[in-house]
Amino acid sequence: MLDEYTAAGGDAAHYRTSEAYLYDLTVFAMSGTKLPYLRDLTDLVAPGAHLLDYGCGIGSDGLRLIEAGYRVSFADFDNPSTRYLRWRLRERGLDAPVYDLDRERPPAGHDAVYAFDVIEHVPDAFGFLAELEACADLVCVNFLRETPDEAIALHRELPVRRLLAHAASRRLLRYRRYHGRSHLVLYRPGRGSLRSRAALAAGRLRS
């Protein structure tokens, strides 16, 4: 994948053209890394809710949630991964929207939007959160703290503490830390409670 990334000339072109990344996502989906995130999401959002998988890639999380009784829409840039997702939906006889973010933004009104292992790929983390907040009544997102041994520059270093403070300034429903460096938050957009901010100030939300 390193050769493909270098040849593409950077992040934007890489994610829109990479076929190797499709296989990387497939292996990652099989690892079970995101299962705790899905458990937290489904713990707070009941089956039947309309969810948005933002930065969906091959759509493995959304397909799991459809099987669990949720209505799921998908959003990402048009690329080999989303074309594979469309094929997976057809093979299952499922009719679910797949929004091309180069052409349109998903509508507001979803019950929840989630983005797992996505925000570290975008140039503007807070702008990305604003996009999520415009789509749904609840946001579920994780913030990765990078390790020194990242093989290639696929991930951007995130201001994790500031992102956690942003979530705490909203109506924070849940915070969890997984795998040592993945900070998961579930919150509702809008001005938050003093309790959420006090929890952060007291050190109960640590990065």
Residue ranges and their predicted role:
Residues 1-108, 129, 151-207:
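Conserved N-terminal segment of class I S-adenosyl-L-methionine
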Residues 118:
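Hydrophobic adenine-recognition pocket in adenosine-nucleotide-binding enzymes
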